[in-house]
């Protein structure tokens, strides 16, 4: 005759309010943890509104040329293009003198950030791999989650935006966390368990990240 084995729940799911102490195993003391924030993922924000007008003046003709080129492709019966793209994207801008100042600032700030993060930059100089202006349609536009390969620093400088403008969304880069993630109690609040964060943007705002 087999003996019936009593099964116990090793993981107790509570329905307590978020403000109450969460007790998984009755009678166990609550440890007073010392929390150390290691492997941080900083995002750097700064404002330089005095460049907006000058850079808009330099960028507008470039975007308009890109727009006209796309319209020509759509009208060309020999071209397979049928509609405008999700965004208007310029060529590399460091070749133009109007963008030399912002290019130099990006290089210097990128070096500073990597230095602050503890990297050994002795004998190393930063190099731009990409620099472009991009315009999304008023109806809205978006990019899926992606990365820019072989770049130690990426960033934005916002020229035209308002309270309705789409905002950049940053995702937790740790693949292990993504594979085992749990549902958040309140996704609107930024917490240790949050998987993404976004920032409202304004003209003249820099955002650097890596």
Please describe what each predicted stretch is.
Residues 120-131:
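A short coil-to-beta-strand element that immediately follows conserved catalytic motifs
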Residues 3-120, 142:
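Non-heme Fe(II)/2-oxoglutarate
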Residues 38, 125, 148-151:
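A short catalytic or substrate-binding loop motif that flags glycine-/basic-rich loops and adjacent residues
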Residues 40-43, 128, 165, 204:
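Sequence-level motif detector for i,i+2 pairs with an aromatic at +2
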Residues 133-207:
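Catalytic core of non-heme Fe(II) oxygenases with the double-stranded beta-helix
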């Amino acid at each position: 005759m087999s003996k019936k084995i009593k099964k116990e729940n090793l993981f107790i799911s509570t329905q307590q309010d978020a403000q109450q102490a969460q007790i998984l195993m009755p009678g166990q003391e609550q440890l007073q943890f010392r929390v150390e924030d290691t492997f941080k993922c900083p995002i750097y924000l700064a404002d330089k509104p005095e460049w907006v007008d000058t850079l808009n003046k330099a960028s507008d003709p470039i975007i308009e040329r890109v727009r006209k080129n796309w319209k020509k492709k759509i009208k060309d019966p020999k071209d397979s293009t049928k509609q405008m793209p999700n965004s208007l994207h310029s060529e590399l801008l460091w070749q133009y003198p109007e963008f030399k100042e912002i290019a130099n600032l990006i290089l210097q700030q990128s070096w500073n950030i990597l230095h602050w993060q503890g990297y050994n930059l002795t004998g190393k100089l930063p190099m731009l791999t990409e620099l472009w202006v991009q315009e999304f349609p008023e109806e809205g536009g978006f990019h899926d989650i992606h990365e820019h390969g072989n770049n130690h620093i990426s960033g934005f400088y916002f020229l035209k935006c308002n309270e309705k403008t789409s905002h950049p969304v940053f995702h937790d880069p740790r693949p292990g966390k993504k594979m085992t993630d749990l549902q958040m109690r309140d996704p609107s609040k930024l917490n240790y368990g949050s998987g993404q964060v976004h920032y409202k943007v304004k003209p003249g705002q820099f955002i650097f990240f890596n």
